[in-house]
A protein has these predicted regions:
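Conserved acetyl-CoA-binding loop-helix of GNAT-fold acetyltransferases
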Residues: 68-75, 203, 207, 213-228, ...
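Acyl-donor-binding surface of acyltransferase catalytic domains
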Residues: 37-147
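A conserved beta-strand-loop-helix scaffold within acyl/acetyltransferase catalytic domains
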Residues: 161-178, 182-208
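Conserved active-site alpha-helix within GNAT-family acetyltransferase domains
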Residues: 94-106, 218, 241-259
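Conserved catalytic-core motifs of GNAT/GCN5-like acyltransferases
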Residues: 108-119, 256-273, 279-283
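Glycine-rich acetyl-CoA-binding "A-motif" of GNAT/NAT acetyltransferases
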Residues: 47-48, 180-183, 245
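Short amphipathic alpha-helix that is part of the acyltransferase structural core
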Residues: 1-24, 121-161, 277-295
């Protein structure tokens, strides 16, 4: 029993399997466009019928639920691959059900909502321009992005595989009072043409505790939306279905709910039990494909 890890030069072989995804397209396509790092495992290196796309935060799974070797690989969760695992998102319902069946109580289903901005530009005017309480909006540079991650517990450097990639392919804005960062809205992922002729940029939002409910997030988000509109991008927003505060802010800013989806994560987001020594890795072949073989056989 074996699975195949594709080199980036062959990622395109797995791309058609993810075309059915209606969620997190910026996260998925960003890997195929080499904007963010990722790894792709398939059941067949020439004509894959199922694929696992691993990137920081979510692991995306597409294709047929009948790919037994890939399902075994996922169930075992080799430590060499699953260090960044946060949760699975499957691109079709039969595959999601298969993953739940394989993992049993090790995973729980988390309902998620996806939004896309489709609001009135003029309705955001109140969040543009000078602020009476001295709040300024600045675009994130490297120093501010590093401070944002460090001081507000954000993950731009993690999502993008480093700040160089974030600055080259992503963007974001922060609100400040003096030199203190009070709120942020930044791209967790960006991808090219995918929705109605536009690209997508998925927003991550945070306000420092002492400054919440004072419009700081709305100002940073407005700058983010304006940047998206100027660069042919649709701003998208994801949140857990029970996060009412996030949903209320999204709707207030003009985001409209898209199709819901599900994330499969461990209870309490505790670390996944990882396998050691169950899969052997062969040297890459001439095309750069790496074969992973189960030591337990078929």
């Amino acid at each position: 029993m074996q699975v195949y890890e594709l080199p980036p030069s062959l990622f395109s072989r797995a791309a058609p399997l993810f075309a059915e995804a209606w969620m997190d397209r910026a996260f998925i396509q960003g890997v195929f466009e080499d904007k963010t790092p990722g790894r792709i495992f398939v059941d067949d290196p020439e004509r894959p019928t199922a694929a696992l796309l691993c990137r920081t935060f979510e692991y995306y799974v597409a294709g047929s639920p009948d790919a037994a070797a890939l399902r075994r690989f996922m169930r075992d969760a080799p430590a060499e691959v699953y260090g960044d695992f946060y949760g699975y998102v499957a691109t079709n319902v039969p595959l999601a059900r298969a993953i739940v069946a394989d993992y049993g109580e090790r995973l729980r289903v988390i309902a998620r909502r996806g939004y896309a901005w489709a609001g009135d530009v003029a309705a955001l005017d109140r969040w543009r321009g000078p602020s009476e309480d001295g709040v300024t909006v600045r675009r994130l540079d490297r120093a501010l992005a590093e401070r944002m991650d460090r001081e507000l517990g954000q993950l731009a450097g993690v999502f993008w595989g480093g700040y160089d990639r974030f600055l080259a392919n992503g963007f974001g804005f922060c609100t400040m009072v003096g030199e203190e960062i009070t709120g942020v809205a930044y791209a967790a992922a960006v991808a090219g043409t995918r929705r109605n002729g536009c690209g997508e940029a998925n927003i991550d939002v945070m306000t420092a505790e002492p400054f919440r409910r004072r419009g700081h997030a709305a100002r940073a988000c407005t700058a983010f939306i304006d940047h998206c509109r100027a660069h042919g991008l649709v701003a998208t927003w994801d949140t857990d279905s029970d996060n009412q505060r996030s949903a209320l802010l999204a709707r207030a800013l003009g985001f409209r709910e898209d199709h819901p989806f599900a994330q499969l994560s461990t209870p309490g987001y505790r670390p996944l039990d990882l396998a050691e020594g169950r899969w052997q890795v062969a040297a890459p072949d001439g095309a750069g494909v790496v074969v992973w073989r189960s030591v337990e056989g078929d």
